[in-house]
Every structure is written in C-alpha cells, then in structure tokens.
Amino acid sequence: MIDPDGYRPNVGIVLMRRDGQVFWGRRVRRDGWQFPQGGMHSDETPVEAMYRELNEEIGLLPEHVQLVGATPGWLRYRLPSQAVRCNRSQMCIGQKQVWFLLQLIGDESHVQLDQSENPEFDHWRWVSFWYPIEHVVMFKRGVYARALCQLASLAQQVVGLEVGTMPQYVQDICLLNVGYKHLPNWVSRY
C-alpha cells in the first residue's frame, strides 16, 4: 500500500522502561540498529498495525504495555535512491509513519525476537532516550529526531523525571531535517 505521493504508511514504536530507557534492536544479519517499525495493512488503523508489529517484531502483547501517546500526524522520510522500489507500477520513495510511545508494564522476559518466520531483530538492549537519533542509519535520523522531540514531553510525564537534555546534535538534526531557522518553542523545553 503506497499513497499517491509515493510514501508507504508505516508505524514506529518507541518502547520505554520505567526508568526512561528505550528498546533498541539490531536488525537480523545487519549491523544496523533501530526501533521496531513496520508497514500498515490496507484494512488496519495505525493502532492496530502498531500492536501487530509489536507482537511480530518483539513478542509483546497489548497487556505487556501501556499506550502513552502518539505523534499528532504522519512523519515522513525518504529512502536513499538505491532503496527506492516499484510495486505494481507505484514507486515507493519513502515511508510516512505514526510513532507510538509505549511503556513496558510487563516483565522484559516477555520480549521474544523470534515471534515471526522472518525475525526483524537478533539482539536488543536498553538505551537512553536520545541515543537512537545519532545511531540509527543516516537517512532515518531526521524522522527519529522529529518523533522523539514530539514524544519527549509524554515520556517525561510517564517516567516522572527528565528524559535528559536534548543533545546539541539532536537540535541540529531538527533544524536540518525539518527546515526550521530557529528551534520551535516545543523543542527548547528539553
């Protein structure tokens, strides 16, 4: 399913522990690490797709998490030219994503990376809230920065402490990838 602009609808998942650390998974047979994410089926809402992807990629069920919130709209990123692909005469140039913030309320022993025939991850760990922005593959850094910036106030409310000061590189990525000349007020709070 690709929209008329060439973007594939997708959901991204930021799974957070009670201490504010977030799930970070290493992709199978690759060096890259990322958050869980996946495409939506044509008959799914973003929330339904998120719960399906949560189970397929990391083995968690709805009762293992609390849905804290989501980005208010679609966040887009373009694929590098070598990754652009056609699907039945439609060209997919990137992904548009709704990002969800979930709090793990179950035991982390419920995390199982082998829930599907084609696992997405082969290893995982907990990292600080802002860490993924600098360590995800380059073409996703902008969308990660926008997603985490939009979810940071929700994360802070849930864990009851600062998710940490937004590092300068995150501010730079926001400026470069969103086109701001100055950081908006909602960014300067962090």
Curated annotation (Swiss-Prot):
<feature type="domain" description="Nudix hydrolase">
    <location>
        <begin position="6"/>
        <end position="149"/>
    </location>
</feature>
<dbReference type="GO" id="GO:0016462">
    <property type="term" value="F:pyrophosphatase activity"/>
</dbReference>
<dbReference type="InterPro" id="IPR015797">
    <property type="entry name" value="NUDIX_hydrolase-like_dom_sf"/>
</dbReference>
<comment type="function">
    <text>Accelerates the degradation of transcripts by removing pyrophosphate from the 5'-end of triphosphorylated RNA, leading to a more labile monophosphorylated state that can stimulate subsequent ribonuclease cleavage.</text>
</comment>
<dbReference type="InterPro" id="IPR020084">
    <property type="entry name" value="NUDIX_hydrolase_CS"/>
</dbReference>
<feature type="short sequence motif" description="Nudix box">
    <location>
        <begin position="38"/>
        <end position="59"/>
    </location>
</feature>
<comment type="similarity">
    <text>Belongs to the Nudix hydrolase family. RppH subfamily.</text>
</comment>
<keyword id="KW-0378">Hydrolase</keyword>
<dbReference type="InterPro" id="IPR000086">
    <property type="entry name" value="NUDIX_hydrolase_dom"/>
</dbReference>
<dbReference type="Pfam" id="PF00293">
    <property type="entry name" value="NUDIX"/>
</dbReference>
<dbReference type="InterPro" id="IPR022927">
    <property type="entry name" value="RppH"/>
</dbReference>
<protein>
    <recommendedName>
        <fullName>RNA pyrophosphohydrolase</fullName>
        <ecNumber>3.6.1.-</ecNumber>
    </recommendedName>
</protein>
